[in-house]
């Protein structure tokens, strides 16, 4: 998100060696973001099991937003930073800035939707999740991730609402004394800084924190319930009751998936929090934050656009397998073994006269799908499969 004079480079400029090092680093960041996000999109498009998981629709849309950042925003910022000049005109400066705000806001909205999807999947019963996350609702959420950011990007920026009261300061900072040229400067007044930051960062961040906290609490409670039922089931039936490894493994898988998404969200916040905190503070201290600091915070946020695909590769088994298949040219060694024809039993546990069905599950696309459908007669939400 190109804010204030975040793109303004040092008044002294860079030496030849510094320019080479800087250009190499920025090029690596851009290339990593392009290839990584393309890999995520191709993986989901080619892998049928990944396409079955509703969360991955948000992940693909997020990858597309990050891909657009790396193609439409970052290269022009890198060129200006290295050359110490903006050569594309004032109108394209406004367009690029609007795209920057739009795509950055869309990214965090996607992460917020992912956290809500995981909340309904893990904290609610399967029927509630199916009723909440219908194809129509998913489509509306995805549409909102792209449409709502337009009201804090293209609309106010093109109308000049962000620079009301600070036009003279903007004109002063646009001028490049070293080359008698201009920079692409984007400064914001106090109302826009507060509104944009609250809508684009602070409200979604609060929702994500609440959602993931509930997921953490629910996952711990589910694990405790499974252990209690397994221990109580053995003496009630008069014979040793083997541990329901499938149910336990399923819960571990869901918990690990939630932790993975928490790490992704945490990296996003670490990358963008310095920028958004400074974005609110700077207008109230007469815009005294150095341009170099803005540039550092801005590119720290850009790095996040290339970071998510690598988090998927290292932390998510299904994505890791899909990436290996693509990179290794469809090597058969990395394909999933077929689960067709497998017989997966259901184990039961009796407590105080009530029968609790612990559904055995098989792994499918990194998620766990039920292979039997008897109804449990107790509040054993932990034993219910999560349809994602």
Swiss-Prot record:
A molecular function GO annotation: G protein-coupled serotonin receptor activity
Side of membrane Cytoplasmic, spans: 45-54, 118-133, 213-257, 315-388
Source species, domain of life: Eukaryota
Membrane disposition: Multi-pass membrane protein
Parts of the chain on the Extracellular side: 1-19, 79-92, 158-188, 284-290
Pfam family, one: 7tm_1
GO BP term (any one): regulation of postsynapse assembly
Disulfide bonds: 93-184
Residue ranges of the TM segments: 20-44, 55-78, 93-117, 134-157, 189-212, 258-283, 291-314
PROSITE patterns: G_PROTEIN_RECEP_F1_1, G_PROTEIN_RECEP_F1_2
Annotated InterPro entries: 5HT4_rcpt (IPR001520), GPCR_Rhodpsn (IPR000276), GPCR_Rhodpsn_7TM (IPR017452)
Main location class: membrane
Subcellular compartments: Cell membrane; Endosome membrane
Quaternary state and interactors: Interacts (via C-terminus 330-346 AA) with GRK5; this interaction is promoted by 5-HT (serotonin).
Comment text on domains: Specificity for G(s) G alpha proteins is determined by the length of transmembrane regions 5 and 6 (TM5 and TM6).
Protein name, entry field: 5-hydroxytryptamine receptor 4
Organism for this UniProt entry: Cavia porcellus
């Amino acid at each position: 998100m190109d804010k204030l004079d975040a793109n303004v480079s040092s008044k002294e400029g860079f030496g030849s060696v510094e320019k080479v090092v800087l250009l190499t680093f920025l090029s690596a960041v851009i290339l990593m973001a392009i290839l990584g996000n393309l890999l995520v999109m191709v993986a989901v498009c080619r892998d049928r099991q990944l396409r079955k998981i509703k969360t991955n629709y948000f992940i693909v849309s997020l990858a597309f937003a990050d891909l657009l950042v790396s193609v439409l925003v970052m290269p022009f910022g890198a060129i200006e930073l290295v050359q110490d000049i903006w050569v594309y005109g004032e109108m394209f400066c406004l367009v690029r800035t609007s795209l920057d705000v739009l795509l950055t806001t869309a990214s965090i909205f996607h992460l917020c939707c992912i956290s809500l999807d995981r909340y309904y999947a893990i904290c609610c019963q399967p029927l509630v999740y199916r009723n909440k996350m219908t194809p129509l609702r998913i489509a509306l959420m995805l549409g909102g991730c792209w449409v709502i950011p337009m009201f804090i990007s293209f609309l106010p920026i093109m109308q000049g609402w962000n620079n009301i009261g600070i036009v003279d300061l903007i004109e002063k900072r646009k001028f490049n004394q070293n080359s008698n040229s201009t920079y692409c400067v984007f400064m914001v007044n106090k109302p826009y800084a507060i509104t944009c930051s609250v809508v684009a960062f602070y409200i979604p961040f609060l929702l994500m924190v609440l959602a993931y906290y509930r997921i953490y609490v629910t996952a711990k409670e589910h694990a405790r319930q499974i252990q209690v039922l397994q221990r109580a089931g053995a003496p009630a039936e008069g014979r040793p009751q083997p541990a329901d490894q499938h149910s336990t493994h399923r819960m571990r898988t869901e918990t690990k998936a939630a932790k993975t998404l928490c790490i992704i969200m945490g990296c996003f916040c670490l990358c963008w929090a310095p920028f958004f905190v400074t974005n609110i503070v700077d207008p109230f201290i007469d815009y005294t934050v150095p341009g170099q600091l803005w540039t550092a915070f801005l590119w720290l946020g850009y790095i996040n656009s290339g970071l998510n695909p690598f988090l998927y590769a290292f932390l998510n088994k299904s994505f890791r397998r899909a990436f290996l298949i693509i990179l290794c040219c469809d090597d058969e060694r990395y394909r999933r073994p077929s689960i067709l024809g497998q017989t997966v039993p259901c184990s039961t546990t009796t407590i105080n006269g009530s029968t609790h069905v612990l559904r055995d599950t098989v792994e499918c696309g990194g998620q766990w799908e039920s292979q039997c459908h008897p109804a449990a007669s107790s509040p054993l939400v932990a034993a219910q499969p999560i349809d994602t």
